[in-house]
């Protein structure tokens, strides 16, 4: 099985278009929930955001495998990014993605989210995989969100 490079690049570009400063990751969480549920993953959002004064909790996703003893994969990423990320425009030069210079790219950690989400999509296509994932809120702020689950 191969990860679809076009899919993961498009996923990343879509993710960087959604601003997600620390403690205000609701738009990103809502997008993730929608995408993961559309792939057939079981999804829940916990109440970690309430505990830290944020707008969302951690997003948990799980895709049960259908083959006993099959290996599983676990993905973890955080949803917040170093500002400024509002209005990010992605530029591709020589096969490398950059911001246009007016904002940060937000690769930390939208790369992790894109990888996890794309693997979830691939896992839905190959159901022998077991796929647990968690996307933390407010990771940049002393791991607040990840410590509240």
Predicted regions and their residues:
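Glycine-rich phosphate- or other oxyanion-binding loops that anchor nucleotides, phosphorylated ligands
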Residues: 144
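A non-catalytic alpha/beta surface segment that caps or lines the substrate-entry region
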Residues: 21-69
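Active-site metal-coordination/substrate-binding segment of hydrolases
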Residues: 29, 55, 62, 69-130, ...
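Short, contiguous, pocket-lining structural segments
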Residues: 4, 24, 28, 108
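N-terminal capping segment at the start of a domain
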Residues: 2-23
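Short amphipathic alpha-helical segments, especially helix-boundary/capping motifs
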Residues: 5-10, 36-37, 90-95
């Amino acid at each position: 099985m191969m990860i679809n490079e076009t899919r993961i690049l498009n996923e990343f570009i879509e993710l960087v278009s959604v601003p997600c400063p620390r403690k205000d990751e609701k738009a990103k969480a809502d997008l993730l929930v929608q995408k993961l549920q559309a792939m057939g993953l079981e999804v829940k959002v916990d109440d970690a955001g309430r505990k830290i004064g944020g707008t969302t909790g951690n997003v948990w996703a799980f895709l049960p495998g259908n083959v006993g003893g099959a290996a599983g994969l676990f993905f973890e990423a955080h949803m917040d990014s170093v500002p400024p990320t509002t209005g990010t425009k992605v530029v591709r030069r020589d096969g490398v993605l950059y911001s246009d210079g007016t904002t940060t790219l937000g690769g930390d950690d939208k790369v992790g989210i894109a990888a996890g989400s794309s693997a979830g999509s691939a896992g839905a296509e190959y159901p022998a995989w077991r796929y647990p994932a968690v996307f933390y809120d407010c990771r940049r702020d002393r791991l607040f969100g990840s410590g509240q689950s």
